[in-house]
């Protein structure tokens, strides 16, 4: 038998936006309110930039702190498979085998949405309409980068290959060298799509109805959470906690999705890197730095 989830009241859009601003940054850290933490981190970062050399010691401290936590995270990840097995066994035991159907729906929805977004928005609208490059030519040129990122699930690791493909589209070196590395950190279209799909998955598994207005709020939060997500495998799953907390959905969703995250990751990274190239094409076109005659993709 299944155990129903006792849903909390879902906050309004206005409440969610207001809750992003922390009244006490240390309380946000202790309660793991990630949206408030990100907001405060942005303010602190801007302040340190304005301080210039005076802020250098603090920046050095945070860089060392970041590297230390990366090492700790790597150690923890070694034990992740055992933890995921235990968590999934617990969730399935509580809620029954019915949770398997939403898995199939989630994988299908994630792949279909990412595919349509990549083909029609990035390839058709951005590269085709705004960039003036044939979508067929665009995707032929991007083929290597797409296959590589599909296998590695890392947009950061794909930067060199994405740079090569983008320059083969006729984008100038100075535009490509700026847009592609920047986009690998800031432009996470696929991650935003995945997080929205994951929330719908959670609502189905735990029997929580989300209104259209609440789904729009989830989409806004997903976009905010995806900005700056690390371009490495599994980072989208970590940032999903922000979106789940925003609508008071159970964090057990992370355990349920962890087992299929690699499959979902393979889909969501493609819009990330294709979007970077499409943006580079649009920017290059607007700046007169796009040279279609240099495109090396075969017709």
Task: Label every model-predicted segment.
Residues 139-195, 220-237, 260-282:
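Alpha-helical membrane segments and immediately flanking helix-loop junctions
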Residues 42-46, 83-90, 123, 127, ...:
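Transmembrane alpha-helix boundary and packing residues in multipass membrane permease domains
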Residues 1-137, 299:
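Signature of multi-pass transmembrane helix bundles
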Residues 196-299:
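Transmembrane alpha-helical segments and their short flanking loops
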Residues 77-91, 151-157, 252-256:
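Hydrophobic alpha-helical transmembrane segments in multi-pass integral membrane proteins
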Residues 51-56, 64-67, 95, 131-134, ...:
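Juxtamembrane helix-boundary/capping and inter-helix hinge elements in multi-pass membrane proteins
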